[in-house]
Each structure stands twice: as C-alpha cells, then as structure tokens.
Amino acid sequence: MLTIKRYPGAIEFTVHTSKSYGTQMFALCFISFVIGATSLAIGRSPKIIITLVELSFLLSLFHIISGVNHESLFVIRDLGVQTNCHSIVPWKSSSKLIPLDSIRDIFINEGFRKFDVCYYMGIAIESETEIHVVFPTLLPRHDVLQKVYKETVILLANNS
C-alpha cells in the first residue's frame, strides 16, 4: 500500500506491509505458546513435542521482530532524497540521505528474486559503485514504482 504526503518543496512516499501479515504471525506465535503451556501443564507430553513447540514459538517470534514494517522515500527539492527502512524494533531501522549533486541517475529496472521477476527502483550515486535500491525489502508493484518515479523526477528536475 502506497501513501503519499506532499509538503512545500518535498514529497514523501511510504510503502506499508500487509496488516494481516503481522496478525498471522502473532496468531502462530500465540498458538504455539498455548500448546507448549498446555503440554507442560499436563506433564506427560513427550519431550520432542515440547521442543518442537518451543522452536516454532522462537522462530515465529524472530520472524515478527526481524520484519520490516514500512519503507519510505523522502524527496526534497534542492537537497536530495532520503530512504528509510522502518522495522518493528527501532534498532533494526535504517536511513540514508543522498545529496542531489551526487545523484547520477534514477531508474526502474527488473531483476530476479528467487524464481520470480520483480521490479525495483534504483539510484545510481556518483561516488559509489553499487546501486542504492529504493524499497529493497518490500519491492512494490511496477505501477507503484512508476508513480513514485514520475513524481520524484519531476520534483528533482524543478531545481530553482
């Protein structure tokens, strides 16, 4: 889901994850916890079941904590762009400011991710050999990227 906020001389694009994803992971985590607590209360469960339930609980919890909540691109005329990746936990969040004079090119390209073709928006930076990918974790659909690309290029081209 794309959210656009407009400011004088700036625009912010935010891509959110599906809200049901976190709910599903919480349900899985809660169910595995209940099964584990019940088997401990009964006291006659085999140790392998308890170990598997604990393992599934910990994996579910790790998946929830390491997930990305939303990613954003903040475009400021005469200054540059800032990319943000917001995680559920604050210490996993990151941001990068790219000054306008170091932006060589902004583009949309297609790439492969596992066995799927996906589109990504990239920023070529003057002093770096690697491309900075915008929305690297969530990888929104092509039509969303086109909308972000058009408005970003228009705003950055209107330098005054």
UniProtKB/Swiss-Prot annotation:
It is a multi-pass membrane protein. InterPro entries: GPI-GlcNAc_Trfase_PIG-H_dom, PIG-H. One of its GO terms (biological process) is GPI anchor biosynthetic process. Its EC number is 2.4.1.198. Keywords: Endoplasmic reticulum, Glycosyltransferase, GPI-anchor biosynthesis, Membrane, Transferase, Transmembrane, Transmembrane helix. GO terms for cellular component: endoplasmic reticulum; glycosylphosphatidylinositol-N-acetylglucosaminyltransferase (GPI-GnT) complex. It comes from the Eukaryota. It is found in: Endoplasmic reticulum membrane. Pathway: Glycolipid biosynthesis; glycosylphosphatidylinositol-anchor biosynthesis. The chain crosses the membrane at residues 22-42, 48-68. It is an enzyme of class 2 (transferase). It catalyses: a 1,2-diacyl-sn-glycero-3-phospho-(1D-myo-inositol) + UDP-N-acetyl-alpha-D-glucosamine = a 6-(N-acetyl-alpha-D-glucosaminyl)-1-(1,2-diacyl-sn-glycero-3-phospho)-1D-myo-inositol + UDP + H(+). One of its GO terms (molecular function) is phosphatidylinositol N-acetylglucosaminyltransferase activity. Belongs to the PIGH family. Part of the complex catalyzing the transfer of N-acetylglucosamine from UDP-N-acetylglucosamine to phosphatidylinositol, the first step of GPI biosynthesis. This is Phosphatidylinositol N-acetylglucosaminyltransferase subunit gpi15. It comes from Schizosaccharomyces pombe (strain 972 / ATCC 24843).
